[in-house]
């Protein structure tokens, strides 16, 4: 079993003078995510690479699965490290690597050498050719294919010689915590968990607000949202979830406002409450799972009407995505099956038969004036009675 993993990253490498900030954040996140994995791990960075070193007694599959969910990582390479004892020893190490990893030697290959240590006495091209020749001598059944090889034999000349031929893809993106914090409006649907995942992939720490409407929505609906948060937390880390009792506000809107405007007005008050908690939590914006035209409340005019009540930016990472693309991501991050469980949330009750799709903001504000005698107290009660749940990965 491999004792060391070479961690590759992409965008971090072009960050110039601030690169160390992103590297340090990545190292910190790797240590945090590995804390519950069986085994002992040391994480260190070294000239454009991060290494995860183990004591050899660890759960390989769980370790790889955990690393493959850490934003900022583009590749996870089980690697063999060797002292530089000359070119002949390097070739011997490559032969041993192939013997160890591949039972069937009838494959095509390419040698890909990289010299991080420029004082090495051979160029990368010379290493490629010479090592390739040694591999062909040792394993005559192999063939060279520089265009589409079945096996890529990677050699990195660093303080230690790095040899690896497997690269497990990571999620990419930027390390968590390098781009501030934002508040996700999380429901039990397909879209908002995906939106949270995508914004977290850009380095944003996410908190969340969920609007609960008992007795019209059940405890199972609430648990469904908590379960979704747990799945997102596998990528984003711990999520602070605000559970808001929205029932009385919804009932007041239903009783006093035009029914074709119910959804827009409810969304506006949801945004106000979510922004309140975002301010408290020092977030820099709100996140929603809205996509243009997907439902009546997500036309351009409707989005403008909900935006109008917000002072901070509203980020919509799914805004131009097709539903099938969103579903693909939800399957990838394992939220889809939970999202389609048949428990209603507050966005699916009190829905108008014919909701307005091109709301006029002045008319909406006029309708909201009907709530003036009750809304301040209802908002205060909803905020004061909000339950906070700290959600960790499942």
Swiss-Prot record:
Q: Does the keyword Metal-binding apply?
A: no
Keywords, sorted A to Z:
ATP-binding, Cytoplasm, Nucleotide-binding, RNA-binding, Thiamine biosynthesis, Transferase, tRNA-binding
Kindly list the positions annotated as binding ATP: 185-186, 210-211, 267, 289, 298
Give the record's GO biological process terms: thiamine biosynthetic process; thiamine diphosphate biosynthetic process; thiazole biosynthetic process; tRNA 4-thiouridine biosynthesis
Q: Which GO terms describe its cellular component?
A: cytosol
Q: Per the annotation, which location comes first and is thus the protein's main one?
A: cytoplasm
- EC number in record: 2.8.1.4
Which major enzyme category is it?
transferase
Q: Please give the function described in this protein's UniProt entry.
A: Catalyzes the ATP-dependent transfer of a sulfur to tRNA to produce 4-thiouridine in position 8 of tRNAs, which functions as a near-UV photosensor. Also catalyzes the transfer of sulfur to the sulfur carrier protein ThiS, forming ThiS-thiocarboxylate. This is a step in the synthesis of thiazole, in the thiamine biosynthesis pathway. The sulfur is donated as persulfide by IscS.
Q: What is this protein called?
A: Probable tRNA sulfurtransferase
Species name: Agathobacter rectalis (strain ATCC 33656 / DSM 3377 / JCM 17463 / KCTC 5835 / VPI 0990) (Eubacterium rectale)
Which taxonomic lineage does the organism of this UniProt entry have?
Bacteria, Bacillati, Bacillota, Clostridia, Lachnospirales
